[in-house]
């Protein structure tokens, strides 16, 4: 399904009161794939609020923040995502976000 159709379907579900972390994650990903990182940040942030342990939401939030030019937000999201991945034992997600985090930290020294 095309991102535009996904967005339409997800937005209808949201309007009908079916708000949850996976819906927000899907909506954020769809907006990200359409080149709308600001909208993606909105929904992915909500996904992490609804399920702080969902490391994939943190990873995508970091990506969306970076695409929106908010490297400090991306760094924070990746750090939280790494914690969430470690807590779940998700080594692959932890490894990926660690790489993304190190790249951003090199580009933005002093973001401790």
Which ranges hold each PLM region?
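Structural marker of alpha-solenoid helical repeat scaffolds
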Residues: 16, 50, 67, 84-88
């Amino acid at each position: 399904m095309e991102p535009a159709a996904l967005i339409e379907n997800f937005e209808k579900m949201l309007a009908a009161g079916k708000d949850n972390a996976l819906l927000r994650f899907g909506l954020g990903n769809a907006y990200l794939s359409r080149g709308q990182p600001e909208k993606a940040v909105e929904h992915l942030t909500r996904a992490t609020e609804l399920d702080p342990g969902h490391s994939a939401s943190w990873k995508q939030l970091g990506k969306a923040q970076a695409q929106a030019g908010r490297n400090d937000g991306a760094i924070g999201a990746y750090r939280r995502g790494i914690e969430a991945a470690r807590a779940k034992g998700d080594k692959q997600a932890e490894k990926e976000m660690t790489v993304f985090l190190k790249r951003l930290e090199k580009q933005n020294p002093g973001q401790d």
